[in-house]
Amino acid sequence: MSTHVEETVPRGRAPERAVVGGAPAPVLSTGLRRALEDVRIAPDGRTAWVRDDEVTAESASAMRFALARTLYEVLHTGRGVKDRAPVRTLRAPDFEARLAKATPHPETVAEGVLTGRRSAAGRRVVEIDGLRVGVPDTATLRETGRTAGGPGRPVVLMNLPSARPLVSPGFFLVDGGAGRTGGGDLLRLYLRVADADAAPGLWHAVLSGLESRSVTYRAKIISNPVSLPRNDGMVVYLGPGSWDAVDAVVESALATGLPEGPPPAFAHVVAPGVTAAWEPKDGRTGMRGLSFGEHRAHVVARAFVAAAERHRERPTAAELAAACAAANVDPADPARNLDSGDWPWHTVPRPAPAGDPVPPAPAAADVSPAARDSTP
């Protein structure tokens, strides 16, 4: 069963902004509205449907969590939950070994603070990201300065294994050879991964492209192929100093032949199989610490449960847009936060080959230049 959230907007034309109280009302992304056409909730709030997946719960709070999980799996990862056996383990050692072999760099550079203490094993204790690590005397520590205040403690750089398979459950994670992402707004690039055969080649190609440019980044890829295919099978994180590497990621990924499939509903299409999103910024209770896809799924789930409390099957487009705005989400482009800057490919010039015209900017807010140029 499919019912429209709002009247369909003709293809190629952005929805018009209604005026409310003298100010333009927030406009809900056309792509998100279409993705939510197959989502509804029973007026009693105990049953909801996301395409072919049915969700049941005994309370509004339980429905918010259950519906958010299904929205995440169906609309973000592209997998769905219907008739799917749960994954028994998040890790597959043989597959992780293939990913480790495909990783082009063995080490990363990490910054830490030398505490001046020794561990029980006699190792120097270095504090890295709030964790205390025992470092043998044979390891080289390069002092770069001292901490502020008091006597100050040495700030050091040290080489560590690039792979950190236990940091993000379900993913094999590495930091770049030149270091990982630092502070500032964090950009996520999602790459659709087809299967176990495609994953190592994609992983190697993208990371090699970044390493050849000495980009600081963090990347992760599904560590158990049973969870494939999925839209976010591989994720690359770029800080402000690395945003100009977006093209390198896209070109390397597309060269491997990414699989076709509907893009994640909440992310911004960059190219076929590649989408982007900013790290969520929502300090409300229950919304902090969520991944991008989880956060957007919870925003939508809350809006649908609120509609059921009014004995309706779905929220209006205006209510969904208001729910996005309350969560610091740009309703017109839900991959952005309301306080996000422009997409990097709008601010970092893309050099065109000599003699080739520079392509015009896209007409719609939902699609990046790369996506427009690659769409028939």
Where do the protein language model's features map onto the residues?
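Polybasic, proline/glycine-rich intrinsically disordered low-complexity segments
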Residues: R230, G239-P359
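Short, flexible coil/linker segments at or flanking structured domains
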Residues: N159-P161, G177-G179, I222-V226, P262, ...
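Generic alpha-helix detector with strongest preference for long hydrophobic helices that associate
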Residues: R17, D52, G183, L187, ...
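Charge-rich, low-complexity segments
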Residues: S2-V193, A308-V367, A371-P376
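A contiguous, surface-oriented mixed alpha/beta subdomain in the mid-to-C-terminal portion of proteins
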Residues: Y190, A199-H268
